[in-house]
Each structure stands twice: as C-alpha cells, then as structure tokens.
C-alpha cells in the first residue's frame, strides 16, 4: 500500500472511530455529535446568527445548519430570537437546558482530549502541520480556522 493511501485510510478510520466514540458517549444525553458541536459553539460564542453559527461548524461546513438548529430548538435547547439590531435576522442562544447539556458535552470532550493527549507523542506538531496543510482552503478547513481564531 502506498504511504498516501495508508494515510488516507488512517485519517478516515481515526475520524470514524472518534465520531463513533463520541456518539456512544453522547447517546445517554440524547445528542448527536453534530448537535453537540452546535451546543458547544453557542456556549463559546453566543449570541450567533444562523450564518455565524454555520461559519464555525466543521460538521456542516459549506452548508446552512438550519435543519440541525431546528431539531435542537424543538428540543428546547436553543432559543431563536429576532436580532437585536435587525429584526429580520435571527439570534441563537442556549436555553438553561442547553447550557446544562453543553457543560456535560464539554466534560465528555475533555475526557476524550485527555485520551488523545496521552497517545500523542513528541512529533504531534508535525502531524498537526500536515493535517492543517491538507485541509487548508477547504470549507471545513476555513470553519476550523475561524473557530481557532475565536478561541485565541
């Protein structure tokens, strides 16, 4: 197998395994990984417009998250209100229940990050540089870059 082919399948397998593990941990909360990403994005950056939220989501990069948001609004986790400066715009914020679940999601994520940190060796920087270069300019790469910039 070529190195590039092996890398492609390793990235795919790691993404699928990470998503599977996260989905398994989120199941008792009644959340999907995409819904959890919305809650965490709003917890960190609310209020956000639908477009503003969409620009930060890796799970929905390049598309509008309106159906995803509709589902969590219906569950009472997110409030959708007219914008403060433009009544035609919509602002999204977490409800108290959404805030509670977001904190639980954050704790699950921290446990997952601790596992990843324990596995990461001294060359992790090289791996991160490669992955950043690989996704640079893509819709998901731009969404991730925006999230990183906002967190700094």
Describe each region flagged by the PLM.
Residues 1-29, 77, 91-92, 96:
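N-terminal leader segment of winged-helix/HTH proteins
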Residues 3-7, 61, 120-124:
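Residue-level recognition of alpha-helical structural elements
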Residues 70-129:
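Charged, amphipathic alpha-helical coiled-coil/dimerization segments
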Residues 1, 122-152:
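C-terminal regulatory/oligomerization modules of transcriptional regulators
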Residues 14, 18, 57, 101-120, ...:
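Alpha-helical linker/hinge and terminal dimerization helices associated
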Residues 20-61:
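N-terminal helix-turn-helix DNA-binding core of bacterial DNA-binding proteins
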Residues 7-10, 14, 68, 101, ...:
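Amphipathic alpha-helix face/heptad-repeat signature
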């Amino acid at each position: 197998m070529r190195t590039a082919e092996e890398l492609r399948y390793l990235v795919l397998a790691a993404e699928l395994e990470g998503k599977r593990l996260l989905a398994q941990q989120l199941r008792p909360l009644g959340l999907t990984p995409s819904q959890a990403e919305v809650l965490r994005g709003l917890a960190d950056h609310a209020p956000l417009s639908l477009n503003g939220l969409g620009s930060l989501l890796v799970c929905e990069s390049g598309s509008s998250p309106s159906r995803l948001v509709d589902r969590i609004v219906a569950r009472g986790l997110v409030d959708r209100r007219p914008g403060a400066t433009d009544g035609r715009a919509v602002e999204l914020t977490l409800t108290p229940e959404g805030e509670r679940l977001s904190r639980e999601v954050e704790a699950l994520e921290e446990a997952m990050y601790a596992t990843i940190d324990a596995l990461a060796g001294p060359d992790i920087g090289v791996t991160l540089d490669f992955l950043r270069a690989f996704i640079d300019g893509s819709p998901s790469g731009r969404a991730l870059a925006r999230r990183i910039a906002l967190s700094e």
